[in-house]
Amino acid sequence: MNGHDQHDQHDQHDQHDGGRDAGQRDEPAAPRLDAAAFTTLRITEGEDRLHARLDRPEVRNAIDATMIDELHALCAHLEHTPKILILSGSPSTDSGADGADPEARPRRGVFASGADIAQLRDRRRQDALRGVNSTAFDRLAKLPMPVIAALDGHTLGGGAELAWAADFRLGTPALRVGQPETGLGIIPAAGALWRLRDLAGEALAKEILLAGRILDAEEALAHGLVSEIHPSQELLDAADALAGRIAAQDPLAVRISKQVFAMPREAHPQVDNLAQAILFESEAKVDRMQAFLDRREARQQDPEPNREQNREQTTSGETA
């Protein structure tokens, strides 16, 4: 993909979507992404979710300018056609220090080892002021539907900042996550300096940001940086299961909840009341509540055959 063409497309999408608000109905579904046009992301798109796999395994999925362009294209599509996004990384085929044939080495899990250092070394003041990575990650964080990051192995530098932009993070026992930028003479300027304070608390955030602390999976789980740990071979199934639970909710209610959650404290409770006013007028609210009442009435009239169903609904969080 050509970077300049991509940015022109992004501007067109932004101008087209800029006036939409969360209460408006979605337009008819746009055509699906042309997965073959992407070179650094592997795209699998379904009806309610899209899986994007970072795919530069020879450099441990380092984030380069092309990947940033493709993340913008991905965001433009999901802004126009809201779906749950699952992010993951291709296993590494990096030959390592021994120079062995990548095909002969065992493939190790990796989400993203950071920004492409060769490109980063050559960037100058004007590149920093453009916010190359931060703009893309912030756009991803503001997508209408939730973003799930499935983290296996190294999740460092820009890779960690991409993960912090997600709404949910799942990991594997091989997870190693941190921000080593200060050791390279720069700062993590794509979101870690302000997102980590909220995610991990000030004390741990400073250890990660100022002292280069790298957390393993259990530490990341204990501090809430990931919500679940799964064996590597089960990670994507777990991400899909989470996406399925989200997809079972009303899409508009999910989208509005995500937007309201991100509002500053001083916007509440007024913004909550306005959001609820939108949802109170939606057909989905009436339909879903009527279906709930119908199920409850059926259980009350004939409770025995519905005992197993009651147990399943209680497990899923539904109550009568």
Predicted features along the sequence, with ranges:
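CoA-thioester-processing core
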Residues: 136-142, 150, 156-208, 223, ...
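Acidic, divalent-metal-coordinating active-site segment for phosphoryl/phosphodiester hydrolysis
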Residues: 213-219
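Intrinsically disordered, low-complexity repeat/linker tracts enriched for polar/charged residues
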Residues: 1-25, 297, 301-313
